[in-house]
């Protein structure tokens, strides 16, 4: 045990209990003394980032791989820069703890006009700004620190959403009592009456269903239930698919797996398998505009049984107080009795384009990339042509597919990949980002080189903001960006870059380069030249829907 043991040490021990081995962030004068404890910690490694926004993205990527992450910023200027990333974690149910180093309590109580404040002697403005984007918050004091740390962390882990701790510089040094046991979160027991009512309603529905299908999405992953879903579809012969954020839940080789459902933009076999079913089991789904090609999904309440983290629905009736795991177990048992074989061959590729020769297009790029993916990869695709082009990729077992289509903050992927590679240093990380998106967060490539990471980064260069061009103003200069020499970027961001770079514009050349980088021996950056106006089918459908809604 570290002596003298203090609040800073208690917080670090609790981060370890939650599964974090690293702390991301940017130093500032209000968190420097806490950082001394981080550096001295045998369990937590400090990971400095280029800026607070990137640090928040990196923490998010880390948490999507490890289940939890922590982020450290300084009061005011630092925490506000990170709020965009924290908001994305909140929207997409990612538990990231935001620790803010703050001025000492005495200075706060005196209302001193300190730097990094609004100059009004008030120190709670930014705390209140964080309330809508975190599930639990606390201002730590000498008296409440240990209790509040545990309360915020357990709430985060239960709800799978971010939390916020304001840590005044002097409070971090105050004496604390070490925890006597590890921090654990026991799932709330199901309401037995509600669970029984749900079982009866679901049984009534499934017993008369001639065709049943399963549609899963990202909340299954957030609540650690991928294995339960995989077992379900192995034991019950039914058609199944995911939505974009849930890609990777199912193995592409599993009989009955159709691919990715995205409303009217779905491949025809996927659309028919899901929308043509009498009953669709929607597990952890969120039918957002970007996931459904502008709300074009054709699924009615009467047709669906829906399972969310803490409640479930049959038809129009909601049953509360039922944890997702117990709802899944209930439905799995019922399906074994009532679901008839509705499987289809699992070899539907999702790709309708036959050739991979000549100049690269969106179609030939994704078909070429498909042959490159292998089990165990971590794939991150940025909002735009990257994420929506990846919708038809068929993922083998144990692939983590990370996208952010609900929050949709471009640039997220590059920094999130830094966090993902930090969490999983021995796995192959593949980054798919547009040129416009990469310009927002490219500094973190320097951190990757510093830490000797070896991601494979594909920059899809279509000379600007292609999504915005598709929505409105295709030739307007506000959709243009500065044109960078991408293959020289690693040289600028490291004094001794261990990196290889290529620029490709032909499908054959891309295939050759991918073969060279397959073993990811060093950081690889591949600039992929694509036609300016070429966009994937889902993105085309989505942008038309978005433009129509914007003009309504």
Residue ranges, per PLM feature:
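Hydrophobic "anchor" residues on beta-strands that sit immediately upstream
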Residues: 213, 378, 430-431
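N-terminal alpha/beta PP-like core and its mobile active-site loop of ThDP/TPP-dependent enzymes
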Residues: 1-338, 375, 454-457
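Active-site diphosphate/adenylate-binding microenvironment
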Residues: 8-20, 26-29, 34-39, 345-426, ...
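Thiamine diphosphate
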Residues: 99, 109-120, 328, 388-552
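Phosphate/pyrophosphate-binding active-site segments
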Residues: 2-3, 140, 166, 179, ...
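Conserved thiamine diphosphate
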Residues: 65, 116-159, 340-354, 471-513
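Active-site flanking residues adjacent to catalytic metal/cofactor-binding acidic residues
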Residues: 283, 307, 381, 434-435, ...
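Active-site phosphate/pyrophosphate- and oxyanion-stabilizing loops and adjacent acidic/basic residues
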Residues: 36, 60, 128, 230, ...
């Amino acid at each position: 045990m570290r002596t003298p043991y203090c609040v800073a040490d208690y917080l670090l021990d609790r981060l370890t209990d939650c599964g974090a081995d690293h702390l991301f962030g940017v130093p500032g004068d209000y968190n420097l003394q806490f950082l001394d404890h981080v550096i001295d910690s045998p369990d937590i490694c400090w990971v400095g980032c280029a800026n607070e926004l990137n640090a928040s993205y990196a923490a998010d990527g880390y948490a999507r791989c490890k289940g939890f992450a922590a982020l450290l910023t300084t009061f005011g200027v630092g925490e506000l820069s990170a709020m965009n990333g924290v908001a994305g974690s909140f929207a997409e149910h990612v538990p990231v703890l935001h620790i803010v180093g703050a001025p000492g309590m005495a200075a706060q109580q005196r209302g001193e006009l300190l730097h990094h404040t609004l100059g009004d002697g008030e120190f709670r403005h930014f705390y209140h700004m964080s309330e809508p984007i975190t599930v639990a918050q606390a201002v730590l004091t000498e008296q409440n620190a240990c209790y509040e740390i545990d309360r915020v962390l357990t709430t985060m882990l239960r709800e799978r959403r971010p939390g916020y701790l304001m840590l005044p510089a002097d409070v971090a040094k105050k004496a604390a009592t070490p925890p006597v046991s590890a921090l654990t979160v026991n799932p709330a027991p199901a309401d037995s009456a509600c669970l029984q009512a749900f079982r009866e309603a679901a049984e009534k529905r499934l017993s008369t269903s001639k065709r049943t299908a399963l549609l899963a999405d990202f909340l299954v992953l957030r609540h650690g239930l991928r294995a339960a879903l995989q077992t379900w579809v192995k034991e019950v012969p039914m058609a199944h698919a995911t939505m974009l954020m849930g890609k990777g839940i199912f193995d592409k080789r599993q009989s009955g797996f159709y691919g990715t459902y995205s409303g009217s933009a779905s491949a025809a076999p996927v659309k028919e398998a899901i929308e043509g079913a009498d009953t669709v089991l929607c597990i952890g789904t969120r039918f957002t505009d970007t996931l459904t090609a502008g709300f074009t999904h054709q699924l009615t309440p009467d047709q669906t049984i829906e399972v969310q983290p803490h409640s479930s629905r049959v038809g129009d009736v909601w049953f509360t107080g039922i944890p997702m795991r117990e709802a899944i177990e209930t439905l799995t048992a019922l399906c074994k009795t009532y679901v008839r074989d509705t499987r289809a061959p699992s070899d539907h590729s999702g790709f309708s384009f036959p050739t991979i020769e000549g100049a690269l297009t969106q179609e030939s790029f994704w078909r070429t990339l498909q042959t490159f993916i292998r089990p165990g990869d971590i794939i991150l695709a940025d909002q735009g042509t990257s994420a929506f082009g990846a919708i038809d990729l068929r993922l083998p077992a144990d692939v983590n597919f990370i996208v952010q289509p609900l929050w949709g903050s471009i640039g997220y992927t590059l920094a999130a990949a830094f966090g993902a590679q930090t969490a999983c240093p021995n796995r192959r990380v593949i980054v798919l980002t547009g040129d416009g998106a990469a310009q927002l967060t490219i500094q973190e490539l320097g951190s990757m080189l510093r830490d000797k990471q070896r991601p494979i980064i594909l920059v899809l260069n279509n000379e600007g903001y292609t999504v915005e061009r598709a929505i409105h103003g295709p030739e307007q200069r506000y959709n243009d960006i500065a044109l960078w020499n991408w293959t020289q970027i690693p040289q600028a961001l490291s004094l001794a870059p261990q990196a290889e770079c290529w620029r490709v514009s032909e499908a054959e050349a891309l295939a050759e380069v991918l073969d060279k980088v397959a073993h990811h021996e060093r950081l690889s950056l591949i600039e992929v030249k694509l036609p300016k106006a070429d966009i994937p089918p889902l993105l085309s459908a989505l942008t038309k829907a978005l433009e129509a809604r914007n003009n309504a």
